[in-house]
């Protein structure tokens, strides 16, 4: 079973292929436009860091290790302080299929040069764990908070040339939730360093991409259970996205999750986003959080129900005003019907 996809319980190889393909296109398109990275110590903006890493995840001794992965966005605010948002997959262990999102503060403890950094980080980890349960489905979607501690080392082999924005990463992550399993993860990955559009001296470039965007999307829903591959459906969505201030955006949309046999759900999503853009709006990466007001035809309780939604997105603009967008939504419910929605979308910016 392939364990490295863009989110967790969807068919994993296909998720990895799509996200890797889009990242490769972004890297190739952005190479000529990148300037040398700056430093907050000189007054120049520090580059943002985006990385994808695979991890070997260890838990109880009687369980063999499994493969996990993560996606991270890090922003440097001062020479010795940075903050990151990340999605972490904590692999599959007996009775536990866990992943989650985290926000960490980072302190570089060996800032030897711009080419090599060693940092220690920590912050809250909100996890989603599919666990065994004595109910009709045989499982429950358990949610909870924990602390995450991390150690991270990066090296940037090239300081000039077409690959100067790439870096390689090694990291260790540790978390021990009070109501879930303890895990220690050892990972390696590849990343991209680039200056966000908001720091460009050209006022028009600093705006990033257009203030408004309409996106029509289509792909699939996967209901989170121990037999997720049997509970999938086609999904479609339409969204309106609006820039609020610099890298902050807001979206409202309609989502139809289809019929997975466990859910038959559709409704309205509203989310706030942190979405920096790069290379004059050529591409962007973002994380969102909000609410999903939906009707589930298979839920006994009548009427609309409000769930949380956590999202990631990556967009690429191949031609003027049009963009291709990859979206992942995690629907977080209180009735054991969490779901992953993966969407490919075509957007129009104006």
Question: For each predicted feature, which ranges?
Answer:
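Repeated loop/turn-to-beta-strand initiation elements of outer-membrane beta-barrel proteins
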Residues: 48-50, 79-85, 111-118, 158-168, ...
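Outer-membrane beta-barrel pore domains and translocons
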Residues: 53-57, 86-90, 121-127, 171-175, ...
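Extracellular loop and loop/strand-boundary signature of outer-membrane beta-barrel proteins
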Residues: 57-59, 89-92, 134-140, 173-178, ...
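Cleavable N-terminal export/targeting peptides
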Residues: 1-48, 80, 113-114, 160-164, ...
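Outer-membrane beta-barrel architecture
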Residues: 70-72, 104-108, 150-154, 187-191, ...
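Gram-negative (and chloroplast) outer-membrane scaffold detector with strong preference
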Residues: 77-135, 237-307, 316
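Residues that define the transmembrane beta-barrel architecture of outer-membrane proteins
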Residues: 63-69, 97-103, 143-149, 180-186, ...
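Outer-membrane beta-barrel "beta-signal"
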Residues: 182-204, 214-220, 338-350
